[in-house]
Regions:
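A hydrophobic alpha-helical transmembrane-helix feature that marks the membrane cores
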Residues: 1-204
Length: 204
């Protein structure tokens, strides 16, 4: 995860200081945003069907994409809003991670509704990128904030159980660890975007 974050930051900085990449991100921002949601979902579906090394390479490639999207967020909202949103999201992530790890409640019963909401929000967000309906913008932003905050707790709890259950299966353990990292990465990324969407419109 640390390597992925370093790659993402490197990608963001290279975009900020290298004009051709800056132009590319500006021209293809909508497609990059959609790809930012589709790629991790695709990896999660294929993770048990393809080689673990390929999965890791795909994850690091996704980290580059995340860096490009963060650079776009800086262009759109400014460094202050972007940084504040990322720090705020990190605080929420830490709290929900602790809750998900230590809670005795069975969170599996929320799995279906959270996953359905996630796919629905991603589809709705992708559509609204083209239509730009203001009321839909706010519905998506606040719904994403609530849903992905909840998903952090659920995913931590779910991965913890999977790791305990498969602790003696090294191959499966590696795949579960990678899947968990990817899911946490996506949860944090979308949570940060939701906060940027809210703070960006509120304070600018």
């Amino acid at each position: 995860l640390v390597i992925a974050v370093v790659i993402a930051l490197g990608s963001m900085l290279s975009t900020a200081y290298y004009h051709p990449i800056t132009k590319f991100v500006s021209n293809y921002s909508t497609k990059l945003i959609i790809a930012g949601f589709v790629v991790p979902l695709g990896i999660s579906v294929l993770i048990n069907r393809i080689n673990l090394t390929i999965n890791k390479m795909a994850f690091f490639t996704y980290s580059v994409l995340t860096g490009l999207l963060l650079s776009y967020a800086v262009f759109k909202y400014g460094i202050g809003i972007t940084l504040f949103s990322c720090i705020f999201a990190a605080g929420i992530f830490a709290i929900m991670a602790l809750f998900g790890y230590y809670t005795k409640e069975d969170l599996e019963r929320y799995r279906l509704i959270l996953k359905i909401n996630m796919f629905f929000l991603i589809c709705l967000f992708s559509i609204n990128l083209y239509f730009g309906i203001p009321i839909l913008y706010w519905i998506i932003a606040y719904s994403a904030l609530i849903n992905f905050t909840s998903l952090i707790g659920f995913d931590i709890n779910h991965i913890k159980k999977e790791l305990i259950l498969m602790s003696k299966n090294e191959i499966f353990l590696d795949r579960v660890s990678l899947m968990g990292t990817m899911q946490f990465y996506l949860d944090y990324f979308v949570l940060s975007l939701a906060l940027m969407s809210i703070f960006g419109k509120t304070f600018t």
